[in-house]
Amino acid sequence: MASYLDFEKNIQQIDEDLANAKIKGDDEAVKILEKNLEKETQKVYKNLSDYQRLQLARHPDRPYALDYIQAILSDAYEIHGDRAFRDDPAIVCYAGYIGGKKIIVIGEQKGRGTKDKLHRNFGMPHPEGYRKALRVAKMAEKFNIPVLFLVDTPGAYPGVGAEERGQSEAIARNLYELSALKTITIAVVIGEGGSGGALAIGVADKLAMMKNSVFSVISPEGCAAILWNDPSKSEAATKAMKVTADDLKTQGLIDDVIEEPMSGAHRDKENAIKNLSDYVLKAIEELEQYDKRELAALRMQKIFKFGAFAE
């Protein structure tokens, strides 16, 4: 059953009326309602606020990492474990082919349904998840295979066990190692990009965001609680923090914005997945002109420009 956000109520009503008309076999009503649905969808999605985009980034029907992997990879083979502690299911790693090209995909997976969400810790990786990601990325470097990172997490898991096993060290190690990785790397924020938990697999030659995704150093609710002692002011915090793809592109913090279907990725997964796949293939083709040492040097130059300012 489809889930609807508060600003999608009119769309929900038309969807329900359309479903009833189809059941009754009322072709005339179906035509009218389909036109109404298209108009209402354009009206709602044409001028989304930052907070509404945040809601879309968290939408439960939005395609997750495994949805993209299963759709774009052929001959996919999953790679497990960090070879030190355990296999963290919040991070998934696959080797396969995209458009006939070898690729390794590393993604954060939130899970669907109660059991799967608990199994994957709601997409909040433990340190062993980040170590698994780094192990697989280093494997890709060894065989000169491009790496695609799919970022989608509310943040790294802040539990006691995770801290005892070196959560901050694991994130820092990934930032250090991925910055100098000698192979093509592409990172795409497909939903939530939550702070260090996202950065740990977000260092790449190309950093892109899906149109309705977000990337921030803290959740808007957390920001509102700290600054105003009022989590209910999260809408104002979202706007002030500039967390959307368009804002981050304007600030030069990401390279590209991947367009989503008018109604959002959650209502048209097939085209959203196609857009991401097309972007990845184009990015690989563009980056193949550089040798691996040039890639690492250019990536480092880009990183050192972040945060630079002049008065």
Swiss-Prot record:
Any one Gene Ontology MF annotation carried by this entry is: acetyl-CoA carboxylase activity
Under the heading SUPFAM superfamilies, the entry gives: ClpP/crotonase
Q: Where does it primarily localize? A: cytoplasm
> Into which EC class is this enzyme placed?
transferase
Enumerate the catalysed reactions: N(6)-carboxybiotinyl-L-lysyl-[protein] + acetyl-CoA = N(6)-biotinyl-L-lysyl-[protein] + malonyl-CoA
Q: Which InterPro entries match?
A: Acetyl_CoA_COase_a_su, ClpP/crotonase-like_dom_sf, COA_CT_C
Q: Which UniProt keywords apply?
A: ATP-binding, Cytoplasm, Fatty acid biosynthesis, Fatty acid metabolism, Lipid biosynthesis, Lipid metabolism, Nucleotide-binding, Transferase
Q: Where is the CoA carboxyltransferase C-terminal domain?
A: 36-286
According to the UniProt entry, what is the EC number of this protein?
2.1.3.15
Q: Where does it live in the cell?
A: Cytoplasm
Pathway the protein acts in: Lipid metabolism; malonyl-CoA biosynthesis; malonyl-CoA from acetyl-CoA: step 1/1
Which Gene Ontology terms of cellular component type are present? acetyl-CoA carboxylase complex
A Gene Ontology annotation in the biological process aspect, one of them, is: malonyl-CoA biosynthetic process
Q: What does this protein do?
A: Component of the acetyl coenzyme A carboxylase (ACC) complex. First, biotin carboxylase catalyzes the carboxylation of biotin on its carrier protein (BCCP) and then the CO(2) group is transferred by the carboxyltransferase to acetyl-CoA to form malonyl-CoA.
Q: Which family does it belong to?
A: Belongs to the AccA family.
Subunit composition? Acetyl-CoA carboxylase is a heterohexamer composed of biotin carboxyl carrier protein (AccB), biotin carboxylase (AccC) and two subunits each of ACCase subunit alpha (AccA) and ACCase subunit beta (AccD).
Instruction: Give the protein name, as stated in the record.
Output: Acetyl-coenzyme A carboxylase carboxyl transferase subunit alpha
Name its species.
Answer: Campylobacter lari (strain RM2100 / D67 / ATCC BAA-1060)
Its lineage reads: Bacteria, Pseudomonadati, Campylobacterota, Epsilonproteobacteria, Campylobacterales
User: What gene makes this protein?
Assistant: accA
